[in-house]
Amino acid sequence: MSDSNNIEDNVVINTITNTDTNDTTPPTTDTNTTPSVTLKRRFVGKKKIAAQQQQQNENIDNVTTTKTTTTTTTTTTPITKDIVTTEKKVKVFGRGLAMAAQQIPDEIMNDKELNLAVKILPSNYNFEIFKTIWRIKQASAKRVALQFPEGLLMYSCIISDIIEKFASVETIIMGDVTYGACCVDDYTARSLGADFMVHYGHSCLIPIDVSEIKMLYVFVDIQFDLQHFIETLKFNFKQTQKLIMVSTIQFSASLQSSREPLSEYFSNIFIPQEKPLSPGEILGCTSPKIKFTSPDGDEENNEIVIYLGDGRFHLESIMISNPHVKSYRYDPYSKVFSLEKYDFQEMYKIRRDAIETASKATKFGIILGTLGRQGSPKILDHLEQLLKSNGKHYTTVLLSEIFPAKLDMFSDIESWIQIACPRLSIDWGYAFTTPLLNPYEAEVCLGGINWQSVYPMDFYSKEGGKWTNYSK
């Protein structure tokens, strides 16, 4: 769980340090070429971004983690490579770049001023500026809403200025918090008078054919030192080890590109898919269940999960849905490769206790999340029927964000069911004074299903249960 008291310490394992690598960390901006686009005073600033990028480069180049079982030792002195780098370079194929380039008109692709403006952005972050401008012009849009996750907001003003100049439109940067693809806020964009919306950094959970306005999803593929990732896996595992590879959408293209060179060394590589997500993609609430092929417990032949990405939130999802599989994380920014652990038994106990307490309640509150598209009216209808059939009284509350202090104001509510983010209950449910159940837990509490021995992570799965978005 996200609380540090419930997570065992990570174990940092063999990490290859390469001080002579072709790193694709965002470079500093070329100061010899000045783009013609006029950057507004609200713009974050090239100098600030360049300084951050330079500091990140220095941190990655100078820090190496040595092999240990319980502690992490770091050194800031330059060291030599401890592997032999292969001559074959790994090709990273961006998502549909070649096809998109063939479709975008030459007057956009070859616009010198536009190309100079795009150089302000990090070269290894694919914001698909050319495609965005082309789509906006195709749609004859006048006002464009731009929605970014927190980690990309620092680039929002640059992108806004570029789009306004080269697409001749007005832009709106939507500053409300965006936790994931479920937070696509097309309703607000429409109410603000936008006729086109660009959502950055997440996959298409909300199909463009059901959104309220014309939409474009930009996944923001991030390229990094892929060769280091490949060599790290080869350095740490035997050729017979079965690898199950997953990532977030930003690194999905790189994950696919790594498959071919890794297959030359490992005999069994598997990239799972939990539809409607892309192959290898996982969400914090949705991950595939891995089918075991080695029930005899032979550790060398068992599957292991390799997660490519920073942070633990998404990784914990596939760990929860596959508690018997070892999980490793490769951070593409720090180049640290670590064995990750999770206290499943404590999580099970906390959530079952909450369900047991809630089962005795007579007055429920149902929270329909209004942050983007988090709340599902279909799930709401299903839970209302369950509550009625169990003779429970309930009140429906609309909330964009859920905090303990806010819910404490509803003193007559004995238990809550939130239809927003399942992980909110799992990770932070203990912080609320009254039980805060997610739809799956409510299903168990109200007798719709028995407690599952493996906690389901299927909230956006096409094969999910009655408590999920795509249930039939």
Curated annotation (Swiss-Prot):
Organism of this sequence: Dictyostelium discoideum (Social amoeba)
Subunit structure: Component of the 2-(3-amino-3-carboxypropyl)histidine synthase complex composed of dph1, dph2, dph3 and a NADH-dependent reductase.
Catalytic activity: L-histidyl-[translation elongation factor 2] + S-adenosyl-L-methionine = 2-[(3S)-amino-3-carboxypropyl]-L-histidyl-[translation elongation factor 2] + S-methyl-5'-thioadenosine + H(+)
GO cellular component: 2-(3-amino-3-carboxypropyl)histidine synthase complex
GO molecular function: 2-(3-amino-3-carboxypropyl)histidine synthase activity; 4 iron, 4 sulfur cluster binding; metal ion binding
Protein's UniProt name: 2-(3-amino-3-carboxypropyl)histidine synthase subunit 1
Main EC class the enzyme belongs to: transferase
Family stated for the protein in its record: Belongs to the DPH1/DPH2 family. DPH1 subfamily.
Gene3D superfamilies per UniProt: Diphthamide synthesis DPH1/DPH2 domain 1, Diphthamide synthesis DPH1/DPH2 domain 2, Diphthamide synthesis DPH1/DPH2 domain 3
Pfam families for this protein: Diphthamide_syn
Disulfide bonds: none
Entry keywords, A to Z: Iron, Iron-sulfur, Metal-binding, S-adenosyl-L-methionine, Transferase
Coiled-coil annotated spans: none
Function: Catalyzes the first step of diphthamide biosynthesis, a post-translational modification of histidine which occurs in elongation factor 2. Dph1 and dph2 transfer a 3-amino-3-carboxypropyl (ACP) group from S-adenosyl-L-methionine (SAM) to a histidine residue, the reaction is assisted by a reduction system comprising dph3 and a NADH-dependent reductase.
One of the GO biological process terms: protein histidyl modification to diphthamide
Annotated metabolic or biological route of this protein: Protein modification; peptidyl-diphthamide biosynthesis
Obligatory cofactor(s): [4Fe-4S] cluster
Cofactor mode of binding and number, as noted: Binds 1 [4Fe-4S] cluster per subunit. The cluster is coordinated with 3 cysteines and an exchangeable S-adenosyl-L-methionine.
Entry-linked NCBIfam families: diphth2_R
EC number: 2.5.1.108
